Swiss-Prot record:
Recorded catalytic activity of this chain's protein: 4-CDP-2-C-methyl-D-erythritol + ATP = 4-CDP-2-C-methyl-D-erythritol 2-phosphate + ADP + H(+)
Protein name per UniProt: 4-diphosphocytidyl-2-C-methyl-D-erythritol kinase
UniProt binding sites for ATP: 95-105
Active site: 11, 137
Species name: Geotalea daltonii (strain DSM 22248 / JCM 15807 / FRC-32)
């Protein structure tokens, strides 16, 4: 049976502003989102056995309907009207519940892969619309560009950002996004700030690094602030928590100092550490 293999990249947030709470309980956001080459490995196959099956084997990642990649494949299979099966294998290289969008990226890969396997010929816009019903970050991974994301993250506009190397550090802590938002104290006045659409250098990127969720997560997990400081000490031009945490990244202009910093932090801790480049 036909099979597709693909990479599902992680993301970081160069900026995350929480503007207001919406009547539906969600929040209006404004974010700069950047894909990186830390990827899950996805394999999607057609099967003669009807239904959708997801195999992962990673603690904290469900295999059935609790996995949004499963729900993505199930939705498109029902849309096709075909009595066939879809098997999805996920090798998790992206830390789970870490602010890197791994689950959303897996979901986006499932939508794009199943669309191809079943020859549905859905456009990226149609896939993004379907993805927005499954997870706020899913459309971004179908968009495949550095983006200014607004609304709940589903309104996307392309942004130009200089290539960079990042050192990703995760202290092996899973953070509940819902808990972070529930404990967030909103501040007024964010709407007036104009987000640039062009970042010609790492210095330009560092100038807009900010995350409204940091204070909440650091309040519960002070190690996140310690990691931010360590990244600056080993040469990062700037450091920031990604998403709701607990991953922190440091930004570098060149590969060699990024790899050197990652090696040093790996030797000194039992944290997940990786030097990655932007996509």
């Amino acid at each position: 049976m036909k099979t597709i293999e693909c990479k599902a990249p992680a993301k970081v947030n160069y900026r995350l502003d929480v503007l207001r709470r919406r009547p539906d309980g969600y929040h209006d956001l404004r974010m700069i989102m950047q894909r990186i080459d830390l990827c899950d490995d996805i394999r999607i196959s057609l099967s003669e056995t009807p239904g959708v099956r997801v195999a992962c084997g990673k603690e904290g990642v469900p295999d059935g309907p609790g996995n949004i990649a499963w729900r993505a494949a199930d939705a498109l299979l029902k849309l096709s009207g075909r009595c066939t099966g879809i098997d999805i294998s996920i090798v998790k290289n992206i830390p789970v519940a870490a602010g890197l969008g791994g689950g959303s990226s897996d979901c986006a890969s499932a939508l794009m892969g199943v669309n191809e396997l079943l020859e549905l010929h859905l456009t990226d816009e149609q896939l993004m619309e379907a993805g927005s019903k499954l997870g706020a970050d899913v459309p971004f991974f179908i968009f495949k560009k550095t983006a200014l994301a607004e609304g709940i993250g589903d309104k996307l506009a392309a942004v130009e950002a200089a290539p960079a190397w990042l050192v990703i550090v995760n202290p092996n802590l899973a953070v509940s996004t819902a808990w972070v938002y529930q404990n967030l104290q909103l501040t007024a006045g964010k709407d007036e700030y104009i987000i640039p659409r062009f970042y010609g250098s790492v210095s330009d990127i560092c100038a807009i690094l900010a995350n409204d969720l940091e204070k909440v997560t650091i309040g519960r997990f002070p190690v996140i602030n310690q990691i931010k400081q360590k990244l600056l000490q080993v040469g990062a031009a700037g450091s920031l928590m990604s998403g709701s945490g607990s991953t922190v990244f440091g930004i570098f202009a060149e590969e060699a100092p990024a790899r050197k910093a990652a090696e040093k932090l790996s030797r000194e801790s039992d944290w997940f550490v990786a030097a990655v480049k932007t996509l």
